[in-house]
């Protein structure tokens, strides 16, 4: 499943603590690949900012996003399943930065090509606060193989909404 681009990443266990962020709704293979890459880079601790509140309002079908507790638990469970010795710190974030601009012990931030600007923004904020710059590690996100589209929680929520609406229609037709 590893793409050739992965070879550009630092070797395993290169950093004491790494950070990454995301919504992590309906934990899917794209999330697992992203979390696995981050876990492999971390020696001691992985900090995962899980989007909540205002960070969710612009998401498609945001009303269908799993509760924050469930998403954080799924992240923690998955990371522990692949690297049990890591300290996993999943926490809700309500802005694009979360712990990445206050935790002075972080050494690297894991991003996708799409979220690279966010990683650069984190380093600008860290510089303003007198914190060290994080090494930015870019993970190539996997596509779903069949269509070549990036795996997306929004797509999964949309499919779920469409399925729910189709199931509702026959019941409504019988009622009329």
UniProtKB/Swiss-Prot annotation:
GN (gene name): COAD
Pfam family, one: CTP_transf_like
Statement: the UniProt record of this protein carries the keyword Membrane: no
Keywords from the UniProt entry: ATP-binding, Coenzyme A biosynthesis, Cytoplasm, Nucleotide-binding, Nucleotidyltransferase, Transferase
Enzyme Commission (EC) number: 2.7.7.3
Organism: Arabidopsis thaliana (Mouse-ear cress)
Lineage, top ranks: Eukaryota, Viridiplantae, Streptophyta, Embryophyta, Tracheophyta
UniProt subcellular location: Cytoplasm
Annotated region described as Disordered, given as residue ranges: 145-176
GO BP of this protein: coenzyme A biosynthetic process; lipid metabolic process; lipid storage; regulation of coenzyme A biosynthetic process; response to osmotic stress; response to salt stress
UniProt name for this protein: Phosphopantetheine adenylyltransferase
Phenotype upon gene inactivation: Plants are severely impaired in plant growth and seed production, but almost not affected in the accumulation of total fatty acids per seed.
């Amino acid at each position: 499943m590893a793409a050739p681009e992965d070879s550009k990443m630092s070797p395993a266990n290169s950093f004491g603590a790494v950070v990454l962020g995301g919504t992590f709704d309906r934990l899917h293979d794209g999330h697992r690949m992203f979390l696995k890459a981050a876990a492999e880079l971390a020696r001691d601790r992985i900090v995962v900012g899980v989007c909540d509140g205002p960070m969710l309002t612009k998401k498609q079908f945001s009303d269908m996003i799993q509760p924050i507790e469930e998403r954080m638990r799924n992240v923690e469970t998955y990371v522990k399943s692949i690297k049990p010795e890591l300290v996993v710190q999943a926490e809700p974030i309500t802005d694009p930065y979360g712990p990445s601009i206050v935790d002075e012990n972080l050494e690297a931030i894991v991003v996708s090509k799409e979220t690279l600007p966010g990683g650069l923004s984190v380093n600008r904020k860290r510089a303003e606060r007198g914190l060290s710059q994080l090494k930015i590690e870019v993970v190539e996100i996997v596509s779903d193989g069949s269509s070549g589209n990036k795996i997306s929680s929004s797509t999964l929520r949309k499919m779920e909404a469409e399925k729910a609406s189709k199931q509702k229609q026959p019941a409504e037709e019988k009622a009329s």
